[in-house]
Amino acid sequence: MSIPSPAHRQPPGALALGGPVVAGRYQLKDLLGRGTLAQVFRAADLDGGPDVAVKVAVDDSAKHFERISNEAAVLAALRHPSIVRFIGLGVVPGGTALAGRPFLVEELALGPSLSEAARTGRHHPDVIAGWARGLFEALAHLHGEGLVHRDIKPANLMLSGLRRSPVRIVDFGIVAAAGSPAEPGVSSGTVHYMSPEQASGGPVRPSWDVYAMGLVLLELLTGSKAFPGTAIESLVARTLRSPHVPDSLGPGWPAFLRSLTAMDSAERPTAAEAAGMAARLMPVPVDEATTPCRRMAVFPARRIRQLA
C-alpha cells in the first residue's frame, strides 16, 4: 500500500490549539506509547468523530515507510471485532518536529493493556476465558489470511470496554506470511513470549501465536511470567522444558494451557480450535443452564496423549 504525500502544511492556528494535524483532520494529543520503531498518539477528530490512534514512525527513512505501508496493508485486509480497524495513512505535513514521517491511523482501543491488567492483580478465570475466546477467534481470522502476528504479548492486547469485543489485538508492525523464512540477523517478537521454534529462528508458523497466547493466559491466571529472568535465561529455559502449569487453576484450564504451550508445535491446537476450547471454559448463560452440569473442555483426539 503506497503512502500519500501530505496535501498541505499545518492549518493556521493548529499548533497553537494542540499538536500537529495529520490527514487534514486528526490532531495529535497524548503520547500513548513509544517503541523502537514508532510512537503512538491519541488524536482528536476535528470533524467530530471519535478519538483515534495515530502511529508515527521514529524517522522518515525508507525502511520505516515500508514498515508503515506494510502494516497498513495488513490491517486494511482484516475485518474482525477483536482486531483494531484501519482508518488511513499518510505523511506528517511540514511545520512540526514530526514532519516527513509516515503515519498510520487506526481505531483507538480505549482500555488498558493486558500488561497493565496483569499488574493490577489476578482476574477471574471466567473473565479470562471470554478474553481468550475473542483473541483466538481474531488469530484464526489472521491465520486464515495466511499471516502470523509474531508479537503476541500482554502489551499488544488491549481491553476495549465493549461487550462484542472486550479485548483487541494491536501492533501488526512485524506481521509475516506463514511459511516465510526467518530474516538472518533480525529478531522478531518479544523474548518472554516466544515459542521454542520462534526463538530458534525457524520458518514463520501460526503455532507461534498460539504458544505466545498460552503464555499470556498463564501469566494472567498466575500473576507471574512463565519464563522470568534475563532474555538469555528465558530463551534457554523454553528450549529445555514446557512452562509449569499449576493443577489448581480450575476445571479445564491446566489441560488447555498445556496444549497451547506444548513443546512440539504439532501438538498445539489451531487458533480456531483454541477459540472453541476457551468457549467451553466460559460459564453457561442462565437461560442455557437447564441442568446442573457445567460445560467441560473437550480437546482434539490427536492431543490426548500430550495431555495425559
Where are these regions (language model features)?
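Activation segment signature within eukaryotic-like protein kinase domains
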Residues: 131-132
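Short beta-strand micro-motifs within the conserved protein kinase catalytic domain, predominantly
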Residues: 85-102
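Protein kinase glycine-rich loop
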Residues: 29-35, 40
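Conserved short submotifs of the Hanks-type protein kinase catalytic core
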Residues: 97-113
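AlphaC helix of the eukaryotic protein kinase fold
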Residues: 58-77
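Protein kinase catalytic-loop region centered on the HRD/HxD motif
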Residues: 137-147
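Regulatory extensions appended to serine/threonine kinase catalytic cores
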Residues: 286-308
